[in-house]
C-alpha cells in the first residue's frame, strides 16, 4: 500500500496552523494493488487519527487497544465513488496549544483554542479566546506564521494600503464565531456568522459538535479548558522578555 498525503496546508499566512479550509483539507491518495480500484473519488470525511487503525487492519493486526480513530478499509475496497459511509458526513477539528508567540504575565506560552465542524456545505468555527492574537502577538512577530516573502509583504502593510485587509485576515484578532459556506466560499474569505439567515444552522452545528466533544471527554466542554495552557512546554521556548517589535 502506498499513501500520498500531507500534514497541513501551505506554509502561508492564514493557512498552515489555521482552521480554515486550506489549512486542514489535505490530499489523500492510496494505491493498493489488487485492493483499491483506481479512478475513484470518495467524499467521505476521514482524519489522520483514522490512518493507523486502517493500516493495522490492512496488515491484519488487531488494533483494538484504545485508538480514537476508525478504519476506513471499507472506503478503500469499495468500488463506489462519492459518499460511501453515511456516518462519515462531517469532521470535528480541534486546536489548542499548537503554536508559540503569546504569553501570560509569567511568560507561560498560551494556546489559541478552537473547535470547529466541517460538513459538505459548511465550516462552523468557535474561537474560545477571541481576546488573544490567533497567530501570536504583534510584538513577537506573529510567530505561529512561518517566515516568507508573503508574510513580510503583509506585515509591512499599513492601514489604508490597498491590500491591508489581507493583513487583518491573516493576523488580526478573530470573533468568537466564524461560519463559512464552503461551496460558495472555499477559501473562507467571507464570515457569515453575523448573518441572521444562518443562525439556526449554526446553532444546530454547534450542538452537534459539542455533543460529540462531550462524548469524547473534551475538557473544554466541562469548564476545564485552561488545563491545556498549564502543561509544561517541552520544545524550545520563546524568550518572551525579548520583544521583537
Which sequence ranges carry the predicted segments?
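Substrate-binding rim/cap in mid-to-C-terminal beta-strand-loop elements of soluble/periplasmic
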Residues: 14-66, 70-86
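C-terminal, low-complexity/hydrophilic appendages and adjacent surface loops
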Residues: 20-21, 100-193, 243-245
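Structural recognition of the beta-strand scaffold that forms the well-ordered cores
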Residues: 1-5, 28-30, 47, 54, ...
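Catalytic metal-binding/acid-base residues of hydrolase active sites
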Residues: 8-9, 35, 187
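Metal-dependent active-site segment of extracytoplasmic phospho-/sulfohydrolases and closely related
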Residues: 1-14, 59
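Long, internal low-complexity/basic segments
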Residues: 25, 160-177, 182-245
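Polar, glycine-rich mid-to-C-terminal structural blocks
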Residues: 70-76, 80-112
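A generic secondary-structure signal for well-formed alpha-helical elements
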Residues: 33, 58-63, 76-80, 121, ...
Amino acid at each position: 500500500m502506498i499513501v500520498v498525503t500531507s500534514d497541513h496546508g501551505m506554509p502561508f499566512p492564514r493557512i498552515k496552523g489555521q482552521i480554515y479550509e486550506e489549512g486542514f483539507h489535505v490530499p489523500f491518495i492510496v494505491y493498493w494493488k489488487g485492493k483499491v480500484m483506481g479512478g475513484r473519488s470518495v467524499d467521505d470525511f476521514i482524519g489522520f487519527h483514522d490512518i493507523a487503525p486502517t493500516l493495522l487492519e490492512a496488515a491484519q493486526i488487531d488494533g483494538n487497544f484504545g485508538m480514537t480513530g476508525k478504519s476506513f478499509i471499507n472506503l478503500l475496497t469499495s468500488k463506489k465513488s462519492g459518499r460511501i459511509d453515511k456516518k462519515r458526513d462531517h469532521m470535528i477539528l480541534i486546536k489548542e496549544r499548537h503554536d508559540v508567540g503569546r504569553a501570560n504575565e509569567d511568560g507561560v506560552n498560551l494556546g489559541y483554542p478552537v473547535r470547529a465542524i466541517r460538513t459538505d456545505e459548511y465550516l462552523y468555527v468557535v474561537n474560545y479566546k477571541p481576546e488573544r492574537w490567533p497567530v501570536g502577538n504583534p510584538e513577537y512577530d506573529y510567530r505561529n506564521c512561518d517566515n516568507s516573502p508573503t508574510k513580510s509583504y503583509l506585515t509591512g502593510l499599513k492601514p489604508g494600503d490597498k491590500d491591508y485587509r489581507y493583513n487583518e485576515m491573516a493576523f488580526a484578532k478573530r470573533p468568537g464565531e466564524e461560519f463559512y459556506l464552503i461551496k460558495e466560499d472555499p477559501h473562507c474569505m467571507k464570515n457569515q456568522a453575523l448573518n441572521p439567515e444562518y443562525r439556526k444552522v449554526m446553532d444546530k452545528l454547534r450542538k452537534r459538535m459539542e455533543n460529540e466533544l462531550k462524548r469524547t471527554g473534551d475538557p473544554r466542554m466541562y469548564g476545564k479548558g485552561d488545563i491545556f495552557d498549564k502543561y509544561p512546554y517541552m520544545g524550545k521556548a520563546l524568550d518572551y522578555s525579548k520583544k521583537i517589535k
